[in-house]
Amino acid sequence: MNEELQQQYYQLEMYGQQVQKLQEELEKIELMKMELLKSIDSMEGLKDSEDILIPLGGGAFIKAKAMDTKKVIMGAGADVFLEKDISDVVVDFNKSIEDLDKAGSMIIAKIEETAKVAEQMQKDLEEKVQAMEGQMGGAPTLQM
């Protein structure tokens, strides 16, 4: 019986790790959404001849003036860049935010489902341990 309890205990730990990984994914999604929202705010608030900072990497920036605030250049992947109207980019970013919201909702549902299974497993495990204690007159030990 101890072997069965150990196996269930390890399974319970696996569910806990799965929930933790899902929560980390959810945090990444929230960060991506925040970055997109910040980009939308920046693009919509940009004015011609406004001073801006251009990131050079490694925490270094260069001062510049915005020359054309109606268009932006976006990376399309594999060193391909496209010039697009800001309004089109905002639409694209809002669509990405919607997609991230859907993915986040799916992850939340999976977290809830996994947590529910783990909670039931924990209850079953506790009941088995209590039953063993009653039969043995003492506390069983889980060997790890």
Swiss-Prot record:
Keywords in alphabetical order: Chaperone, Cytoplasm
Cellular component annotations (GO), alphabetically ordered: cytoplasm; prefoldin complex
InterPro entries, per database record: PFD_alpha_archaea, Prefoldin, Prefoldin_subunit_alpha
Places the protein is found: Cytoplasm
Pfam families: Prefoldin
BP GO annotations: protein folding
Domain of life from the UniProt record: Archaea
Task of the protein: Molecular chaperone capable of stabilizing a range of proteins. Seems to fulfill an ATP-independent, HSP70-like function in archaeal de novo protein folding.
Quaternary data: Heterohexamer of two alpha and four beta subunits.
UniProt family annotation: Belongs to the prefoldin alpha subunit family.
Protein name as it appears in the record: Prefoldin subunit alpha
